[in-house]
Amino acid sequence: MKTFFKQVLAVVVGMLIVSAFTFLMGFIMLGAMLSAGDSKPVIKNGSVLRIDLSGNLQERVQENPVSAFLGMSGTEEQGLDNILKSIKIAATNDKISGIYLESGIFSADMASLEEIRKALTDFKKSGKFIIAYGDSYLQGAYYVASVADSLYINPSGMLDWHGIASQPMFYKELLEKVGVKMQVFRVGTFKSAVEPFIRTDMSDANRAMVQSFINDIWTVACKDVSASRKISVDSLNALADNYMALTDANDYVRTRLVDRTAYIDEVRETLRRLTKTEHLNMVSPAELAAYDESANGANGQIAVYYAQGDIVGSEVEGVISSGQQILGPKVVDDLDRLCNDENVKAVVLRINSGGGSAYASEQMWRAVQLLKKKKPVVVSMSGMAASGGYYMSCGADYIVAEPMTLTGSIGIFGMVPDASGLLTEKLGLHFDVVKTNEASDFGAMGRGINAGEAAAMQRYVERGYALFLRRVADGRNMTTAQVDSIAQGRVWTGRQALNLKLIDKLGTLEDAIREAARRAKVADYGIVAYPAPADWYTQLFSDVKDDYMENRVKGMLGVYYKPLQFVYTLQGTDCLQARMPFDPNLR
């Protein structure tokens, strides 16, 4: 028996030693993964910056090495900031011979694609090459790749050039079938975010608005491609009418959309010849961006504060939440810290948002007013800065937007669901109430809103709209009547907004930074991005579970993911919304 216990004890001790060793080695490996991003990669002579036009493009991406290691990172995300930095560095780095663009399935708004394209156009002034290849080109990726010196497509490849369409989904009859009715309150002829819940088609006003801005975006895209590919705009429109995605690859050569057909091995051989190297040395945007030294500056910093996603008053969590969010209270605190940071001489707000909570938007507007009393505040609009996104922008000293930016949408709406048809008529649930005051049970889902409540709700929405108009009028030196005439929830492109004086200049983030520095009267400045990245511990555990679950929920729900996400987000936010009237992803 004594021998038996000795053997058991030996096994237990052995297991503890092995577990401790495994635990220690695991932490060493995690430490190595987390610290790997802090070291600069070695770049060899004749290297090529490879930019994959694939995945989801975000303003900033903080890579989670644990998620990637466990295979839970879902759809690949790329940071626009890294792409722009790497292109700028590649132009002056002697070890970079040129840029290689490889096309895939690329999800990005047109304004962000336009900014990448402009950066590549500037890069060409260095005299270095840009080569593009694709097994296939979707329209957004082709728009960027068309700037290349040489454009190749696989002999069996596909190029999709079809124009722009907006195809909103309407849920009214679906909700009626399950017994839910959305009670809507809004201000603005064009504030059509509620239309999917109360109609089965677009209103005439909404249709006219959407037609206006997609025409403007398409005009810019065609002019850019026309200049690069030496194809007339009329010819590009004719090609867009002819189902180019279904034609033979040789037709792309004949119509000058591409230069030639080639297999990937032939393109690699071309790159080896151009770089005069036997083995291709490719570097990614993230690797080259590690060489960015723009944070160094003798006379202080220009802070670039990134705000992307739905505007919310409190964090909305869950596997069908809206992803990246602009959390109002956090932004207010962050801007207060930047206000009191003496090393920060000016702030650029980089905004990519279709809006959200009207209350949170108002609080962030106030934070911007306090900030600009101490230092210049310049807004750089990315793909969207509409509704609540414009609300937080309008009080800045100066606003810069891309020609294809979607902005404006100055309007307010509110929605209250009436689920009595579902709960009572279909499920047999009945409700009774005992209350002390008339408004005690306002908003209960077991009944609809009565006439008095509806009138109060409409007044509430109208007060929110009137406040929005005053904020824009004060910020843009206009009267409220002038603002109202171009507001009403209408969405404008950056080009249109410039003519309406809703913005000050068409340009890039780089232009906004230069304007902020000019206003702060600093020449030698550093550029620092905010909010600061999460610490390693937070980064280690953040999003691993949610990424894993979200990826699978998206797969199960398919096209129904977006509408469910929208309703879920509204449920967890404020009743009053300053939000874009539609999903801006144009196809």
Segments from the language model and where they lie:
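Cleft-lining beta-strand/loop regions that shape enzyme active-site pockets
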Residues: 40, 47-168, 177, 295-422
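C-terminal long alpha-helix characteristic of the crotonase
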Residues: 227-228, 259-301, 413, 469-475, ...
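Short glycine/threonine-rich loop-to-helix capping motif typified by GTGT followed
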Residues: 358-363, 496-499, 541-543
